[in-house]
Amino acid sequence: MARDNENILEEWCLIESNPCIFYDMLKRMGATEISVEDVYSLSYFDDYINNKEIINMNHILGVDTYLGENNKTLDKENNVVDVIELYKNNICMEDKYNKLLKHHSYIYGIIFLFNIGKHYKNNKYIEHNVPDNLFFAKQVIPNACATQAILSIVLNKDIELNDEIKNIKTFSLNFDSSMKGLTLSNCTFLRNIHNSYKPPIYLDKEDVHHDKKKSEDSFHFVSYISFQDKVYLLDGLQSGPVLINADEQNKPNPNNNNNNKDNDNDNNNNNNNNNNNNNNNNNNNNNNNNNNIGMNGKDWIEISREHIKKEIDEICNSQTNNDVRFNIIAVMKDKEYIIQEYINIHRIVKQRVNIKLINLGENIELSDEINEDEFPLLNDIPSIENLPNNVDTLYNIVNKSTLEINYLQSLLHEQKEIKKLWNKELTFKFFNFYPFIMSSLNLMAKHKLLKDAYQKEKLKNATKS
């Protein structure tokens, strides 16, 4: 949504912790396949922690039940779709897609907002070997933490971004964290995006309690990510990236010491098989696959969640801070994008089955045609030649694929409605209604309606009280 940035000041404004703002910010940074979700309870992450099994075409087409087990191994032949078993009756669509849409690898990072009080410790950073390509910037200007929290996630993941954003990382590659912070704060492109979320001010006279309220409400955004098999808290007020559970993460796992070589070979073989046979979603999963390995058996989301809970407990138990408001936002792959990929897979299956029926002499017309050349890894989807020759079986596949498409389209509609509501909320938050309000009041006064309206409202309020 375009907004007026002509009078943007050099300072950075305060930003509300709101999914509609972060989603819009990501889109303007070029992260078109990324979205955010509000986390109302730490149990929200349970499904994502449990669903680590790599998704393959058998899961999407209802041949195998997706169990979500991290340690489940698949032989190469098991990845080949059994066309006779397409869309099994015993697999619940709702349960299937609830798991497939909450896959572990879809979460890129977690943003935590909290009120900084006297409890805040700015010495959490303990010196360690920080990876050279880990992007961390110190916050050198007030109120920039919201944008820095987003950048701390997207610049450390394989996410497509605008050239302006990618150039920031390239330009500041050899800078220390303070210089990286200066680079961010002096980037006009970023500052204009950030400051466009400043609500319009309708009255010049500030509230008499403004300064007091401002001093009391000091909130801060930080990010949690996994990077090279480690979990990091990226907080711009710290001296460096904080390694979470550093002692635990650096402990050697005795179960792995004896068989590292064999395990590595097995993992490589499994990875090669999976890479050849998984669909496009799996490729995206593997791009972020520093998620659950090398942390002494603990999952990075689980480690982050435990650390956030510990932070919340410390703040709640602190007698110096009476404001215990928090907010958690998960930055993840956009469900709308994932659902559309699944819809396209089922549309291709349906189209191929219909072509097979035509080849067998059935009098049907192709509808909902899809250009298969636009989609990668089509070899994972059963070819026309490999489909069964039984007409009844083929019609059954068509009917079930239609049900899958209809169900997914209902999920897609829900996601689109969420985005519409966010867009509407953004409009109301940042549209300047002042000229409209003043024009309305002037017209009411001109036609001698203002005084009567005022008296009616005054009488109404007096009656209520």
UniProtKB/Swiss-Prot annotation:
The processes (GO biological process) annotated in the record are:
protein deneddylation; protein deubiquitination; ubiquitin-dependent protein catabolic process
Under which EC number(s) is this enzyme classified? Answer: 3.4.19.12
The top EC class is: hydrolase
- Important for enzyme activity, annotated site positions: D235
Q: Which GO terms describe its molecular function?
A: cysteine-type deubiquitinase activity; deNEDDylase activity
- Cellular component per GO, a single term: cytoplasm
List compositional bias (Low complexity) regions by residue number: 251-292
Keyword annotations: Hydrolase, Protease, Thiol protease, Ubl conjugation pathway
Looking at the record, the residues that make up the ULD domain are 432-460
Extract the ranges annotated as region (Disordered): 244-293
**What mutagenesis or variant effect is reported for N18D?**
No effect on deubiquitinating and deneddylating activities
On the tree of life, the source organism's domain of life is Eukaryota
Q: Which residues of this protein are catalytic?
A: C145, H220
Q: Which reaction equation describes what this protein catalyses?
A: Thiol-dependent hydrolysis of ester, thioester, amide, peptide and isopeptide bonds formed by the C-terminal Gly of ubiquitin (a 76-residue protein attached to proteins as an intracellular targeting signal)
Annotated UCH catalytic domain ranges read 11-333
Q: Where is this site: Transition state stabilizer?
A: Q139
Family per record: Belongs to the peptidase C12 family.
Q: Domain remarks in the entry?
A: The Asn-rich domain is dispensable for deubiquitinating and deneddylating activities.
Q: What does this protein do?
A: Thiol protease that recognizes and hydrolyzes a peptide bond at the C-terminal glycine of either ubiquitin or NEDD8.
- Name by which UniProt lists this protein: Ubiquitin carboxyl-terminal hydrolase UCH54
- Organism of origin is Plasmodium falciparum (isolate 3D7)
Q: What is the lineage of its organism?
A: Eukaryota, Sar, Alveolata, Apicomplexa, Aconoidasida
